[in-house]
Amino acid sequence: MQAACWYVLLLLQPTVYLVTCANLTNGGKSELLKSGSSKSTLKHIWTESSKDLSISRLLSQTFRGKENDTDLDLRYDTPEPYSEQDLWDWLRNSTDLQEPRPRAKRRPIVKTGKFKKMFGWGDFHSNIKTVKLNLLITGKIVDHGNGTFSVYFRHNSTGQGNVSVSLVPPTKIVEFDLAQQTVIDAKDSKSFNCRIEYEKVDKATKNTLCNYDPSKTCYQEQTQSHVSWLCSKPFKVICIYISFYSTDYKLVQKVCPDYNYHSDTPYFPSG
């Protein structure tokens, strides 16, 4: 009966079997399992009672009651004692290994529109020299690629005279009438959407030698100005309109840049 009981315990509950054998071998050591906290029980079993609880001794005592008496000598090194902090660290590390690694964040792909060509400062310039005035106007056009573009002008003059630089539709008539220089027809207002974004004018005066008579001193006025226009769709073609008036010289000029140069669709003038 005793042997049958041992076999049942061995097959059903191996843990209970080991504890029972430990009690049969040395009854005094069973107090280690009853006293003390649950956290330090494992540490006491594998340190103080390592000789009495060796696996080779437990197995040999178990198989001696059988007909074929066999002693098994299994080497088992006593493990090093672990502190409570070591056990917590081990549990924390094992938990971290099981957690899935976060996916690397990919940078969003920004689809940028195809930027069109632009006119630089050297692509447009107007240089006017008279006896009493020296004028230089440069400009550039920048297409922002989002349906808008900017037009910049720089004006530098020395002498006396009136200069006007503006943007007009291609249907603007070239004429000397000052009253009609800034007038835009109603039919062109839908295709011409431009406004002044920035404007600055600096003036200074100085006395220099006269151009017509170097032996005399003339009063000259220097003017520097910067202006920028912002245009947006819908638009077709813009033209640069320059009007210059002086005591000895008059000039009205309209310059329309090649629209095919900075646009995907060709422009066909009408009217």
UniProtKB/Swiss-Prot annotation:
Annotated region (II), positions in chain: 22-97
GO biological process: modulation of chemical synaptic transmission
Highest rank taxon of the organism: Eukaryota
Region: IV (linker domain), residue numbers: 177-185
GO cellular component, one term: GABA-ergic synapse
Name assigned to this protein: Neurexophilin-1
Signal peptide residues on this chain, from the entry's feature table: 1-21
Mod. after translation: May be proteolytically processed at the boundary between the N-terminal non-conserved and the central conserved domain in neuron-like cells.
UniProt main location, coarse: secreted
Keyword field contains Signal: yes
Tissues with expression: Brain, only in a scattered subpopulation of neurons that probably represent inhibitory interneurons.
Subcellular location: Secreted
Reported function: May be signaling molecules that resemble neuropeptides. Ligand for alpha-neurexins.
Sequence segments annotated as region (V (Cys-rich)): 186-271
Glycan attachment sites: 23, 68, 93, 146, 156, 162
Keyword set, alphabetical order: Glycoprotein, Secreted, Signal
